[in-house]
């Protein structure tokens, strides 16, 4: 498992899957009013496919809950619109070198050593981004720290 760079915030962390087919890149939200605690993209390498993701805090029980979307419409959208473009949703965890799992922390926190997205691989295989000329390798559910974006 990878070790995050000292001083790297979650908002600047970049992760890779074990097969080198995906890159998960966090980017700053920079808004105290935002409902999300983190924003990220998941790039299917060697394709033009890039998915948008958000992590939101959820209470009872306390969880960091993520959503991964592809080509969602902008503006005033319905729940059906969001469901149609959602590829995956679920808990988002950090995993340290000891294998200890915790909720992914907000963007200002130190970068996690690994990010665990349970079930993301099977969800991608069942989605609109899977197939010839698209994603052909399903990511492992754990992505390891790769670098800190500048």
Residue ranges and their predicted role:
Residues 2-14:
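N-terminal helix-cap/turn-to-beta initiation motif at the start of protein domains
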Residues 12-39:
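Short, solvent-exposed loop/hinge segments that bridge or flank secondary-structure elements
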Residues 22-28, 51-53, 102-106:
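Broad, structure-driven detector of short, well-ordered beta-strand segments within folded domains
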Residues 88-89, 100:
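Long, ordered, amphipathic alpha-helical scaffolds
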Residues 34-83, 146-150:
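Central antiparallel beta-sheet cores of small beta-barrel/beta-sandwich binding domains
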């Amino acid at each position: 498992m990878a070790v995050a760079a000292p001083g790297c915030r979650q908002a600047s962390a970049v992760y890779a899957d074990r097969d080198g087919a995906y890159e998960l890149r966090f980017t700053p939200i920079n808004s105290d009013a935002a409902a999300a605690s983190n924003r990220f993209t998941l790039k299917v390498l060697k394709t033009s496919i890039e998915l948008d993701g958000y992590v939101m805090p959820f209470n009872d029980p306390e969880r960091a809950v993520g959503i991964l979307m592809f080509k969602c419409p902008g503006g005033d959208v319905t729940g059906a619109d969001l469901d149609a473009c959602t590829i995956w949703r679920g808990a988002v965890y950090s995993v340290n070198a000891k294998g200890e799992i915790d909720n992914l922390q907000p963007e200002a926190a130190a970068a996690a050593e690994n990010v665990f997205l349970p079930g993301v691989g099977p969800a991608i295989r069942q989605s609109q981004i899977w197939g010839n000329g698209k994603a052909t390798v399903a990511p492992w559910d754990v992505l390891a720290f790769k670098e800190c974006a500048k």
